[in-house]
Amino acid sequence: MSEISQAQPDYNYKVVRQFTIMTIVWGIIGMGLGVFIAAQLFAPMLNFDTPWLTFSRLRPLHTNAVIFAFGGCALFATSYYIVQRTCQVRLFSDKLAAFTFWGWQAVIVLAVITLPMGLTSTKEYAELEWPIDILLALVWVAYIINFFGTLVIRKVSHIYVANWFLGAFMLTVAILHIGNSMAIPVSFTKSYSLYAGAVDAMMQWWYGHNAVGFFLTAGFLGMMYYFVPKQAGRPVYSYRLSIVHFWALISLYIWAGPHHLHYTALPDWTQSLGMVMSIILFVPSWGGMINGIMTLSGAWHKLRTDPVLRFLIVSLSFYGMSTFEGLEYLPLAAES
């Protein structure tokens, strides 16, 4: 970020704007759907005796809309913006960028059609059937190629810390999605998981937990490491702490999935490992929160007038506080 070129590069802002607009659109739809199905809990007649309007079919659509449509479009938009600005070069491929936009919207629209129809793999956060999974994987691989291709052709020597988190989130989500979605198709709209029993449960929550850990945490931390310093007009509080934060987060988070499967058929050692990692995770999480908030050192006065900065700091504060949830495993640790 310290290296500023004299000539303004010709960035691809079109795809950034497209994803930003769809972030707003899908956010409204996804959260509106959440309000609707929440209302069904006290007024079941709101399903109007229509199968595709029942809670059990709309709830997966709500989670997919908020996580992958709303959150996904936000991540695409900001990562494409950040990688261009920090590398001072246009995206590696405009065609790949366009493919990721239209491909991602196609995945979302197909989810909107199939999930209310009851066409689902039954795996939480991975409900989409195998043809859509393949399309999603193709879009994601194109996304990875475009992002890392841009890093390769960058005009600055340094890879800014935000790109570390964004790159880690992309690679890990690819591995998680492909690994967990391995299935045996029996028709165009139905398949069965390649795994069975406790192994299937372990694969599912290795994916499910780390969808939160990398899609909704590492990716958004990449946003934080760019936009908080940018909005505050200050450098990152501690670059050394950001390095520790990065490696600690990606080293610990991937192991915590078994905490979704306590007191199940999963081997005890696996459950214990997930429990311990869940407790330890508050350390890198608080490191990131402190690094983000302390970046405002010398610029606290901007909170009075800058609403964007207020939202960023409040989100960091709630991120830090939410990590105390991991301490609920302390009684289990005592039992062990």
Regions found by a protein language model. Give the residues of each.
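Cytoplasmic juxtamembrane interface segments
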Residues: 2-12, 141-159
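Flexible, glycine/threonine-enriched loop-and-boundary segments that flank and lead into catalytic domains
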Residues: 335-336
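Helix-boundary and loop/linker segments of multi-pass membrane transporters
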Residues: 12, 57-59, 301-304
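Membrane-interface segments at the starts/ends of alpha-helical transmembrane spans
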Residues: 53-59, 124-125, 197-205, 269
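Hydrophobic cores of alpha-helical transmembrane segments in multi-pass integral membrane proteins
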Residues: 17-45, 52-119, 130-151, 163-188, ...
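Extramembrane terminal tails and long inter-domain/linker segments of multi-pass membrane proteins
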Residues: 1-17, 45-52, 192-200
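Alpha-helical transmembrane segments
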Residues: 293-305
